[in-house]
Amino acid sequence: MRAHEYALDDDIVAIATALSPAALGIVRTSGSSSIERVASFFSRAQALTRARAHTFLHGWILDGKTRVDEVVLLVYRAPHSFTGEHAVEIICHGGVRTVQAVYRLCLAQGFRAAQRGEFSFRSFFHGKRDLTRIEAIQSLVDARTCAAQQQAVLHLSGALQQEIAALTRALLAFSATLQGEIEYPEDEETRVHDIDMRELEPLVERLRRLRACWQERALQRTGVRIVLGGCPNAGKSSLFNALLGQDRAIVSSVPGTTRDWLEADLDLSGIPVRLCDTAGLRVTDNPIEAQGVVRSEQLLQGADCVFYIINGRAGVQAADCAFLSDCAVPLVVVVTHNDLMSMSERIQVCQAVQPFISAPVLSCARSQDARGAGEQCLAGGKNGEVRDRAPRAFVCVSAKTHAGLDALRAQTLHLLHGGQVPYEELSLGSERQYVLVDAAVQALEHAQEAYARGFGLDAVVHDLEEALYHCGALTGEVHSEDILDALFEKLCVGK
């Protein structure tokens, strides 16, 4: 069933929590008769039908005279609910059988099974949420980092809706001024020279900034895969654990301990990272380890960024130089065991790695509170020795003391994105929103150009009306059935 075909007169029900063993499960209902229908199988029927909005009731779900589960009901009265309708949420124990039994009782009492996104559609239909806040619900569910979660909450609270509403009011006021000049011209000229088109520029700039923020946050949406590579016993697994803040990989002084690759999620300043620890790169007669090496090579070739690990105590090996010469993806050379290295060892490693680094800069701080010029190393390519390649960086770290990890994160962010992203700034929440804002910007820029080239005010007003249409489509004030269908089918059942 498509969103615009939902039967709004039906009472609907859905299981709102994951259907798996858990402490609690929620069965969600909505509709004009939802309270009475739930009362028909609730032990305190009269108390439920008389309950005020936002009231909790404790009791039993009954199948005839048989008790099904001890529950708590949360009662909503229209219009003070998510959907704008009467609604009851049944909070039961989280066993799969129990939740299904309660759900089946709802269906038996005349509730219809809700479709994908139908609760949210009713919220939109009854004016409880605009489309930006509806989309924020799914963004909140999909958020993989704290920054994404905070941006979704910002949208859910109505910040984007309010921004677009303010822009719309300003555009309407400006358009009304132009309309007045057209309807009541002071002379025979269609164009009136005292119209200050500069008033339009701040509005265009605000929309441009929303568009730019969406483009700047591409990595926040797509995420990146960072693969740790290097020779056996270089310290890959130790660094993997240090970055995660937990012991996920087995660490041993025995070379070849890691035979298969491990993966874990990491939040890199708002960018979701899939971090991979791999088997050490070397020629081996062990068939199992050899398979691990092949997988490591494949993962390194397909990475968005490589952390190539070198044991600072062992120095740079021929195998390290071979890999650094051939690697074609963004790469950070990470020298480990920095807490155990002498100054001469640091200098030797820096000199050996220098020809392979095209982007200088990195910290080789010996400890978190180390000071002094001797504790820093800069690596930069020599003239004629650095070929064109993907961006690279060089950091010395200690997985034991965590010295240098902040520098590693900062350099990685710089390689992938070019610097820190101000995630607290309001942005757009979906590709649909980006397309509409981009269209609005183009319409307003066309209006500015039309006025500058001496076209009549009618042409300018036409462009303003087009921009207003796109702003209205963004919040849902104007919409088509196809847009609603595409948006609400992305939401899960129970949303």
Swiss-Prot record:
Q: Does the keyword Manganese apply?
A: no
Q: Which residues bind K(+)?
A: 233, 252, 254, 257
Q: What is the role of the protein in this entry?
A: Exhibits a very high intrinsic GTPase hydrolysis rate. Involved in the addition of a carboxymethylaminomethyl (cmnm) group at the wobble position (U34) of certain tRNAs, forming tRNA-cmnm(5)s(2)U34.
Q: What is its EC number?
A: 3.6.-.-
Q: Which family does it belong to?
A: Belongs to the TRAFAC class TrmE-Era-EngA-EngB-Septin-like GTPase superfamily. TrmE GTPase family.
Q: Which cofactor does it need?
A: K(+)
Q: Which Pfam family is one of those matched by this entry? A: TrmE_N
Q: Where does GTP bind?
A: 233-238, 252-258, 277-280
- Highest rank taxon of the organism: Bacteria
Q: Where in the cell is it found?
A: Cytoplasm
Picking any one GO molecular function of the record gives: metal ion binding
An annotated GO cellular component of this protein is: cytosol
Enumerate the residues binding (6S)-5-formyl-5,6,7,8-tetrahydrofolate: 28, 89, 128, 495
| Disulfide pairings | none
Residue sites binding Mg(2+) per the record: 237, 258
The Gene Ontology biological process annotation of the record reads: tRNA methylation; tRNA wobble uridine modification
Uppermost EC category: hydrolase
Task: Quote the subunit structure annotation.
Answer: Homodimer. Heterotetramer of two MnmE and two MnmG subunits.
Q: What is this protein called?
A: tRNA modification GTPase MnmE
Show the taxonomic lineage.
Bacteria, Pseudomonadati, Spirochaetota, Spirochaetia, Spirochaetales
The annotation note on the cofactor reads: Binds 1 potassium ion per subunit.
